[in-house]
Amino acid sequence: MTALPSAYPEASSQMPAAAELACRMDAARLAEELSSVSVVSWQKQRTHVLGLDGESELGTTSPPTELEWRVLPLWSIGGDADRTDPGGPEDKGYAPTIWWSRLPCMREVVSAIPVPFNSVRLMALGPGASSDEHCDPKYDVRRGFCRLHIPVLTNPDAILVLDGVRYCWAPGELWYGDFSRLHRVENRGAEVRVHLVIDALMTSDLVQLFPARFRQSFEDHGALFNSFGLACADCRPWAHPRKFAIPRSFLNFTDDAPLETSEPKLSVELHYSDRNVYMKTVNGTVLAMTPVGDSRFRFSGWSDQRTVVVDDGSIVLESRFGHDRRTSRIFDQVDSDH
């Protein structure tokens, strides 16, 4: 995915692009466990559609890559073992796949990292495979996301080039990379390169594993730390669907500035049903929502970067990027039936 133009100041280039975190894994155990699923047919990597662009519907996935780049998902949207994409806002949240219970060492390793994780995937880059240079804007700590890598198998000729710097991370290490910057991967070796890739929500606890200079940089540039701990049952319910016309771009999750008032509007409904909260668009797309505060919700599969506050007679749309916070109050559309 290529970055879209942003209305926010560009600061990520001033932050370090990668860091080894203060956490080491048992590389031999990881490799041994990997061998137990090496005979399984891994599927090719796909990407996830994050925007309502008029052509591709939010929540759909791309065709499989032509590269020899295969995935075994351990956590995915709905726990679907066929989902090789990283996922995002959809009608359900993330859940373990059948492979999660069958790989106890990897389960232990991932669970020990102090983050709530979304997608967890084993990703295998075959010999001779190489990607085009690209960037993934989602994985910017100012958006509240981070992507972590634990190499399991590698070779000296299997590399990542991130922000112009060449990396070959060793098995058992835990690395953070700012994949919102330009990067590419290639494997010129004779052996497959396998990484355990964890897409997580940024937290203040995770930051403690970073080198000191990163911790200061995150503070300076407004890394977004997410909120947790509430259930929908803890929130004040509403009896009938709430109807609003919101900027269409608010549901384009590739857009860093989704609250422009000149944007075309999209009719949506907010539902509270059986202690579940979701947003439904006029074309039937359903997006599950998670509480992050009293009457404040984020989209499942997303971060606190984009939230909805439910008030009496209105909602407040919030968008954050680093230190920048933008809001827009939208009033209910009157429904004569209620």
Show the residue positions of the predicted features.
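A short beta-strand-loop-beta hairpin characteristic of the jelly-roll/cupin
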Residues: 151-170
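Non-heme Fe(II)/2-oxoglutarate
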Residues: 1-109, 220
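A short hydrophobic beta-strand segment most commonly corresponding to one strand
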Residues: 146-151, 176, 190-207
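Contiguous, well-ordered beta-strand patches that form the walls/edges
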Residues: 275-308
